[in-house]
Amino acid sequence: AYKHYNALDMYQACDDLGRAVEFLKGCEFVEGRLGVLGYCLGGTLAYSLAANEHLSAGVSYYGSGIGEMLNKTPRMAFPFLFHFAGDDHLVAMKEVTRLKPLLSATGDATFRIYEGQRHGFNCVERDSYSMRAALLAKADTLRFLAQHLVR
């Protein structure tokens, strides 16, 4: 996974995602509001779309590169839910503490911290998986998406 991560052109990936949102918004079969959700790198990529006016909600699970994206997203165009693990080797709590006021200043940001959990707590295939934390995060995510996407 790290080999692919290191080879990824973040600028191109973000541009591709923006174009995908534009495409979906123009499709006749897409009804209602669109949201974005991602895990780890996907959580960072989801946040890269935070200024996209075509989206209505975003969710990031332990996005490990959000700090580097802050200067590219002066404001969030829609509410965003951020899930972070309390004992994450890729996103230290010091970084989460730094990010909270910065992200909150750019828009409607909600934070959930899962104390004692490690990166990947939501992935059943990892030894860091926590059913309890995963179920709590899923419930929060579903409530959040229903609140912002369902009319």
Give residue spans per PLM region.
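N-terminal cap/leader regions of alpha/beta-hydrolase-fold enzymes
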Residues: 1-151
